[in-house]
Amino acid sequence: MSLRIVHYNDPVLRRKGEKITAFDKALSQLAKEMLATMQEAAGIGLAAQQIGRPVQLCVVDLRRAEIDFTWELDGAKPPLDLIMPMIITNPEITPDRETDVYLVEEGCLSFPKIRGDVPRPDAITVRYQDEHGTPHTLHCDGLLARCIQHEVDHLNGVLFIDRMEKKTRAAIDADVKTLAKITRAAAKLNPA
């Protein structure tokens, strides 16, 4: 079942997610529906806020990515197909001390057709729980690190446009304002 992805200017995108405490069938079902929604939208990550649920849950799947990245999960390097798709709850990110910050173009399913360069640390460690509540430590870099940082920002009410340099944000500002107007108009037509 595909869920509706909320677009920019929906207030839920600015809400910090509540910590997940119940690792039950309802959580597994929500994660499954989020994965289906993300895949249908041709995305590589999706946060719960993007489907209107302000909780600390996101999903990531980079199996089809054509950009290199490295990972180590709980001290091992399992094949990518064994760790993807990832269901991440209650994440905490620590950028590596010696990592570089790179400016790379990002998009977002809540900002259709809007893209811009975003500075992010290249390598991170993320501590999280999976859908069963099992704790994990993931060290990663490249696209995987960028994707997780983008989704975890959503979980904290931070959007990729907030991280852009002023020049980049100014270049897309008209498109962002247009999207905000469309979202407001749609909310008036279909109040929750």
UniProtKB/Swiss-Prot annotation:
Binding site for Fe cation: 108, 150, 154
Gene3D superfamilies assigned to the protein according to its UniProt record, in alphabetical order: Peptide deformylase (3.90.45.10)
E.C. number(s) listed in UniProt: 3.5.1.88
The record's free-text note on cofactor binding: Binds 1 Fe(2+) ion.
Highest taxon of source: Bacteria
InterPro entries xrefs: Peptide_deformylase, Peptide_deformylase_sf
Keyword Protease included in the entry's annotation: no
Keyword Transmembrane helix annotated: no
Enzyme class per UniProt: hydrolase
GO annotation terms (biological process): co-translational protein modification; translation
Reaction(s) catalysed (UniProt annotation): N-terminal N-formyl-L-methionyl-[peptide] + H2O = N-terminal L-methionyl-[peptide] + formate
Catalytic site: 151
One GO MF term: peptide deformylase activity
Keywords, alphabetical: Hydrolase, Iron, Metal-binding, Protein biosynthesis
Co-factor requirement: Fe(2+)
Disulfides per UniProt: none
Coiled-coil portions: none
Transmembrane region(s): none
Family under the similarity heading: Belongs to the polypeptide deformylase family.
Function: Removes the formyl group from the N-terminal Met of newly synthesized proteins. Requires at least a dipeptide for an efficient rate of reaction. N-terminal L-methionine is a prerequisite for activity but the enzyme has broad specificity at other positions.
PANTHER family tied to this protein: PEPTIDE DEFORMYLASE
Protein name: Peptide deformylase
Organism: Opitutus terrae (strain DSM 11246 / JCM 15787 / PB90-1)
